[in-house]
């Protein structure tokens, strides 16, 4: 089950997965409790239950000093990055308990391990996700449900291009080069690399893994 706000993007993703059977989509905003509950109910109706949750909704928000941020800007990032993850967990836990097992994977960020000027809402939200994951892992371990987080570094996708243009509006390419210079592996990661880590955490190869944060950052945090 693919869940997201954009029907057009969901359709495009489903078409990319045309080689797989039983791929369907449900339009819902992760910050909308009723819509999230409905998405989980639709999943149960279509597949008989919930085995795996990948909480992947996220936004970078606008970059600004703390004193310049508006309440709306700060709340918007936290609603998507924290409330969205929590709501997805909230409505997937009971179906997983009924099956006696499950794997919850929250896509967070290296931002949950560091500070960064002008990124207060994003940094705060990703620290919160790590705390939520650790707490949920402790609550749910006895029910056979594993909860882990993935902490990507810079990944070659829309979000990093948005950040590049905000870091240096006059020369996004220079921002790109500066960010890459901070990565020991000297490149951005790919969506596929993050997906492969999620597959590991979703599968039987990781049945003793819970409450952990898996960095995929080209060595950024180690540097």
Regions picked out by a protein language model, each given a short descriptive name:
Residues 141, 146, 209-211:
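Short, small/polar-rich loop/turn modules that mediate ligand/substrate recognition or access, typified
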Residues 89, 125, 133:
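Active-site helix of classical SDR
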Residues 109:
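Residue(s) in the substrate-gating loop at a strand-loop-helix junction
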Residues 1-12:
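Conserved glycine-rich Rossmann-like NAD(P)H-binding loop of the short-chain dehydrogenase/reductase
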Residues 86-89, 187-216, 221:
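C-terminal substrate-recognition "lid" of short-chain dehydrogenase/reductases
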Residues 64-66, 70-75, 179:
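Substrate-binding pocket helix/loop in short-chain dehydrogenase/reductase
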Residues 130, 147, 152-166:
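Short, flexible catalytic-loop segment of classical short-chain dehydrogenase/reductase
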């Amino acid at each position: 089950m693919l869940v997201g706000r954009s029907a057009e993007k969901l359709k495009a993703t489903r078409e990319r997965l045309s080689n797989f059977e039983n791929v369907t989509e449900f339009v819902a905003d992760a910050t909308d409790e009723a819509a999230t509950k409905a998405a989980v109910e639709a999943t149960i109706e279509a597949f008989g239950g919930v085995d795996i949750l990948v909480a992947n909704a996220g936004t970078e928000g606008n970059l600004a000093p703390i004193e310049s941020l508006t309440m709306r800007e700060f709340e918007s990032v936290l609603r998507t990055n924290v409330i969205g993850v929590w709501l997805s967990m909230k409505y997937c836990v009971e179906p997983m308990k009924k099956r006696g097992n499950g794997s919850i994977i929250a896509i967070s960020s290296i931002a949950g391990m560091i500070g960064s000027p002008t990124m207060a809402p994003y940094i705060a939200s990703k620290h919160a996700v790590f705390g939520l994951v650790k707490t949920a892992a402790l609550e749910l371990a006895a029910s056979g449900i594993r909860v882990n987080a993935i902490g990507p570094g810079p990944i070659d996708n829309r979000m990093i291009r948005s950040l590049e243009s905000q870091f240096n509006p006059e020369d996004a390419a220079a921002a790109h080069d500066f960010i890459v210079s901070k990565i020991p592996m000297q490149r951005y990661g790919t969506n596929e690399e993050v997906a492969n880590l999620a597959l590991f955490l979703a599968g039987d190869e990781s049945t003793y893994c819970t409450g952990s944060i898996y960095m995929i950052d080209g060595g950024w945090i180690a540097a």
